[in-house]
């Protein structure tokens, strides 16, 4: 399938990405788990004219149902995960739209074309002195893209050697 636009309109959720954060206290267990699933704008378009915190009970129930579906699917890989959840937070494309001002809540920024990757490659440096960019639309999109472009932006400020020295592992 075309992985760049792949989405199955299945109920319940049929695909997730599970990310477990490395514990800072040396514990072999994580305290934080992120679960991500694709969601097209059409799923939340009915609330597009609303604001954060003012979307009503139907929207809250929709988010709760999607969170429950994600956790249930994650439990096929992490048994009893739901029983271990102390707090949970969910977002939709509306959340991304309202907090990041991305069109229709895009979480991945400018669409990249693997046939011609240089066409959408942006650099951190701008023509405006001391104005630098970072984020999902510069080089790589998504969660990893934001992390990588932050390093590119830091390299513009500190120099590549300084960033390499900071990120180098023994």
Give the positions of each predicted feature.
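Short, glycine-/Ser/Thr-/acidic-enriched flexible segments
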Residues: 11, 22-25, 38-42, 115, ...
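Mid-domain catalytic core of redox enzymes
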Residues: 1-28
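Short acidic/His/Gly/Ser-rich catalytic and metal-binding motifs that mark active-site loops
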Residues: 42-49
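Flavin-binding catalytic cores
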Residues: 28, 55-94
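A glycine-rich dinucleotide-binding beta-alpha-beta segment and adjacent secondary-structure elements
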Residues: 76-140
């Amino acid at each position: 399938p075309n992985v760049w636009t792949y989405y199955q309109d299945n109920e319940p959720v049929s695909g997730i990405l599970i990310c477990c954060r490395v514990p800072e206290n040396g514990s072999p267990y994580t305290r934080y788990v992120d679960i991500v699933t694709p969601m097209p704008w059409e799923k939340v378009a009915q609330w597009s004219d609303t604001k954060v915190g003012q979307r009503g009970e139907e929207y809250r129930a929709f988010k709760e149902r999607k969170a429950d579906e994600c956790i249930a699917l994650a439990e096929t890989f992490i048994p009893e995960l739901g029983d271990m959840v102390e707090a949970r937070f969910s977002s939709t494309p509306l959340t991304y739209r309202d907090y990041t001002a991305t069109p229709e809540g895009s979480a991945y920024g400018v669409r990249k074309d693997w046939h011609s990757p240089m066409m959408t490659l942006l650099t951190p440096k701008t023509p405006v002195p001391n104005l630098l960019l970072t984020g999902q639309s510069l080089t790589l999109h998504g969660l990893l893209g934001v992390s990588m472009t932050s390093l590119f932006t830091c390299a513009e400020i500190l120099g590549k050697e300084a960033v390499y020295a900071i990120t180098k592992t023994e």
